[in-house]
């Protein structure tokens, strides 16, 4: 992968993460300015994140996931990571 390929890939991923954040935020009827305030960032920075022009930190992604009721996996990859209980894991081992 060349540096140009990496930058294009990174920009695409950054955009997708921002779009997922924006969609969930709108679905939850949370104003961008309110989410920005919780994250202790300016509202224009929140806009840049949602439009794929800025990255979030890992702690910011965690807080966003908690506020929006999703996993960090969903924000990063668009897939919800399923967790299972210890009892379910033990049952699978028996099989």
Predicted regions located by residue number:
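Short basic helix-loop element that most often maps to the first helix and adjoining turn
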Residues: 19-38, 63
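A composition/secondary-structure signal for short, hydrophobic, low-basic-content segments
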Residues: 10-12, 38-41, 56, 84
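DNA major-groove recognition helix of helix-turn-helix/homeodomain DNA-binding modules
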Residues: 57-74
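Recognition helix of helix-turn-helix/homeodomain-like DNA-binding domains
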Residues: 39-56, 77
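A short, Lys/Arg-rich alpha-helix, primarily the initiator
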Residues: 2-27
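Short alpha-helical elements of helix-turn-helix
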Residues: 17-19, 44, 58-61
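Short, charged recognition helix plus adjacent turn
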Residues: 1-7, 76-95
């Amino acid at each position: 992968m060349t540096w140009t390929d990496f930058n294009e890939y990174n920009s695409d991923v950054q955009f997708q993460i921002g779009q997922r954040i924006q969609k969930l935020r709108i679905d939850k009827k949370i104003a961008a300015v309110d989410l920005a305030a919780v994250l202790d960032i300016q509202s224009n920075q929140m806009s840049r994140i949602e439009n794929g022009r800025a990255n979030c930190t890992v702690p910011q992604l965690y807080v966003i996931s908690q506020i929006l009721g999703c996993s960090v996996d969903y924000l990063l990859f668009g897939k919800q990571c399923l967790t299972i209980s210890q009892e379910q894991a033990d049952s699978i081992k028996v099989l």
